[in-house]
Amino acid sequence: MSDIAIEFDDVVAGYGDFMILNNLSLQAKRGRITLLLGPNGAGKSTVLKTLFGMLKVRSGHIRLHGQDITGANAKDLLVKHGIAFVPQGRNLFGQLTVWENLELGGITLGMKTTHARIPEVLARFPRVKERLNSAASMLSGGEQKQLEVGRALLLRPKVLLIDEPSIGLSPMVVADVFKLLRQLADQGTTVLMVEQNVKSALKMADEAIALESGRLVMHRQADELLADPNIERLFLGGAHQAATPPSTGAASAAGIL
């Protein structure tokens, strides 16, 4: 069995007529944490959204564990292929309770299975467990992010896509989230993530892929890259000029890239 979980082969994808991924080819290994790096607009979040079926593949192929999933929709990717996606920002139903948000996260499983799995998820997030009857909007930023991750874990995903998990969180909560991701990978889950705190993320990641203008420019072991004295110049602002989408239409929002 191949150790390659995710494979992009000359993928072109984007928003409307504006292509962000330009014949992108990359691979991510099974049971590893692969970190996507690059300046704003390089295509990091676009990779996740394309893989999760939220953006149309204009050309090229995407394979998961050797199976061509090009063109599959998000529901099929979630239910049939075991891909879960935790997007950037807060994506909860604020007026609903923690318990109700978890129930909705498991809607494709059926309530019996969902209720059986919720205690398993809550065991990973004791602070969230204490707030089961609270509205999601009343949770702290860290608790909300933990709830989002927990909701994804209800599905016992084979592949977890996570976009900027540290935004708005305290260093202590970020450390907890990174520790959980490391545990999941060690247990066999493939994690593909985008993260602004490059150095912290590299410390717990296995591999790193750098993008520029929707193309792969580097794929290295995370520990090797962490030791590179040029890391800050390369990935914390300065070395590359990224593509900038048009100012009109949905692609104008910086958060989508």
Language-model features: locations:
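The feature captures the beta-strand-to-loop junction immediately N-terminal to the Walker
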Residues: 37-39
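ABC ATPase C-loop
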Residues: 152-153
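Conserved ABC ATPase signature
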Residues: 135-139, 143
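Helix-to-loop junction immediately C-terminal to a conserved catalytic motif
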Residues: 52
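ABC-type ATPase nucleotide-binding domains, specifically the catalytic core motifs of the NBD
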Residues: 16, 34, 56, 96-116, ...
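Conserved ABC transporter NBD signature motif
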Residues: 60-69, 79-81, 114-120
